[in-house]
Amino acid sequence: LTWKIPTRFCGVT
């Protein structure tokens, strides 16, 4: 799942 801004480490969570 793609979040808002923290897509660098949370873009796959």
UniProtKB/Swiss-Prot annotation:
UniProt keyword terms in alphabetical order: Secreted
Keyword Secreted part of the UniProt annotation: yes
Cellular component GO terms held in the UniProt record: extracellular region
Name of this chain's protein: Antioxidin-TR
Main location: secreted
UniProt-annotated location(s): Secreted
Tissue expression pattern: Expressed by the skin glands.
Source organism per UniProt: Phyllomedusa trinitatis
